[in-house]
Every structure is written in C-alpha cells, then in structure tokens.
C-alpha cells in the first residue's frame, strides 16, 4: 500500500492523488485502504514518515559522530547522493509537502530521530577557533551542504535540459558530485 501511495503521491502530489487510484495501484479495494488509513492525509504522512525514516538515521549518524568537519562533509555528500539514487522521489516529495503544508515539518521535528545539528555547530565553531576552518557560520555551512546536495535532485529535469544530458549521462554527472561537492565546499572553508 505504501509503495503504491508513494508512486501516486510522487506523480500527482498530495492534492492530485486519489484514494481510489492508490487502492487500484496497490491491488486492493478502497475500503481496505480506508481501514488502514482513514484519509489521504494519514496515508501521506505514513508515506512521508517511512521515506524520512530511511534518511534521518544516516544524517544523524554523520552529523553526530566524532569525525572532523571535512570528513562529515565527505560522508554526508557521498551517503546523501547514494541514498537519493535509490530514492529519487524523496527531495521533490519533501519540497512539495513543505510548500503545501509548512507546519508539517514542525510535527516531523518533534519525532525521535529528526536530525540534530548541535554537535555539528559546536565542531564547526571549534575548528574555526582552532584555525582549521575559515570563519563561517555553522548554519550557513550546513545550508550550503544541503543546497549543493539536494538541488540536483529537486531540479533534475531543469538541469538535464541545461546540461543537455540524458538520464544515463546525468546519473554519471551526479555520481561525480560525491567528490566534486565535497571538494568544492572543503576548499572554500579550509585554511590551508
């Protein structure tokens, strides 16, 4: 059911999705779908929570381990891009829901396992103080890392058109970003 719902929500969005279409795609009747998920919003939240629960633990592990900021950036970039290769619908899905319902993320934020950047912020501040990193706000650095990793997935059709790449060539380009993005960010913040 969740896989069918994910596919319909991904292609039609929350507002365009219909419970009957989801039931048909899942090979069940609509009454059964309503038995498990009383309404479309509850089903959507289950799909979103399921998808987010796959990514959040990875982010938390990277953000809260004891490695250097450079290593965190490399691990985050590589893991995020590998994860998105397996779940390419997720970034657009999240952005779409945040635009449709900004309060939804506040509910998510209260869930156990929501990524916490406090240790990352402390580490950035310490590495700046130790002269390892150029002066930079930890929040700005985190936003830069997120933006450079998320945007190529959210804007895939646009970027494919700009770069004149088909799916296979675009996927190769994305694979190279595992090192390109990390190198770009690290070279911009590291004191050499």
Identify the residue ranges that each predicted region occupies:
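Amphipathic, non-transmembrane alpha-helical scaffold segments
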Residues: 2, 44, 48, 52, ...
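Short hydrophobic clusters on alpha-helical segments that form packing/core surfaces
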Residues: 1-9, 80, 185
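Residues in soluble alpha-helical coiled-coils and helical-bundle/repeat scaffolds
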Residues: 27, 38-42, 46, 64-68, ...
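Amphipathic alpha-helical segments used for helix-helix packing
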Residues: 85-106, 156-164
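C-terminal peripheral helix-coil segments that are non-catalytic and often amphipathic
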Residues: 79-82, 86, 114, 118-134, ...
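Helix-turn-helix
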Residues: 8-42, 46-47
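Hydrophobic alpha-helical connector segments
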Residues: 60-92, 130, 138-142, 175-178
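Amphipathic alpha-helical linker/stalk segments
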Residues: 47-75, 117-128
């Amino acid at each position: 059911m969740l896989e069918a719902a994910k596919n319909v929500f991904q292609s039609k969005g929350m507002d365009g999705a219909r419970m009957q279409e989801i039931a048909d795609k899942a090979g069940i009747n609509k009454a059964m779908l309503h038995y498990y998920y009383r309404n479309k919003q509850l089903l959507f939240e289950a799909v979103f929570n399921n998808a987010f629960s796959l990514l959040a633990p990875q982010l938390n592990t990277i953000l809260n381990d004891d490695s250097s900021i450079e290593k965190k950036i490399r691990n985050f970039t590589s893991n995020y891009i590998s994860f998105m290769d397996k779940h390419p619908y997720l970034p657009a899905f999240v952005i779409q829901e945040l635009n449709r319902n900004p309060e939804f993320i506040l509910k998510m934020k209260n869930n156990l396992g929501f990524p916490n950047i406090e240790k990352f912020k402390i580490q950035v501040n310490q590495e700046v103080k130790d002269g390892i990193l150029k002066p930079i706000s930890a929040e700005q650095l985190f936003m830069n890392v997120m933006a450079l990793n998320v945007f190529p997935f959210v804007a895939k059709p646009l970027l494919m058109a700009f770069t004149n790449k088909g799916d296979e060539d675009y996927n190769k380009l994305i694979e190279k970003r595992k090192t390109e993005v990390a190198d770009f960010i690290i070279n911009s913040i590291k004191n050499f």
